Amino acid sequence: GNWLVGIDISGSMEHAMQPGLLLAAYLARQVRDKVLLCFFNHEPYVKDVTGRTYAELVEMTKLIVAQGGTSIGCVVAAARELQFEADAIALVSDGGERHPPDFGSAYRAYSAWMGKEPPVYLYRVPGDDPDWLSARYGGTLPYQCFPVEKSINEAGVVALAATMKTKRYGLVQEIMDTPLLTMEQALRPPKQWRIDYAIAT
């Protein structure tokens, strides 16, 4: 499916860039469809990063400076303006909003235009503002929040990203579809153990 990734570059969010680029690069490698990257403060700056590597994204964004206010809603408003239909949305931000459009109203307009509600994942980095996004919309939108430290590494981002799905209950369905082991399979030692035992004896 198509992914929309928003990275907060408002004044207090200079540390959102690294996890945001790691996330965008991971999705760009993994998904078969498009990845649209939107840097945002009170305005959106949009790039198609489908197929890009982390090194390419770092080079592409080295002149971006964290400054300005915050409008998380402008991410989905920009996607709608570009006629980009996202199957899922990932945001890297502290969840604070100070400028219109607010995320809730922009998301509902975007969803109505597409005829579907894409799941929203917030990678919440530390910031100066309270996490208004979770407080306002956590119970009303298909929404999940991942608290993220300032210094998260690639392995940490990938571990979180691997749980994201383009359907609201995609991970639950994947777990339910996984065949259960029989008692014999569960108690059977791994093949490598049997090889090591045979060599030892």
Language-model features: locations:
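Acidic, glycine-rich A-domain
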Residues: G1-T201
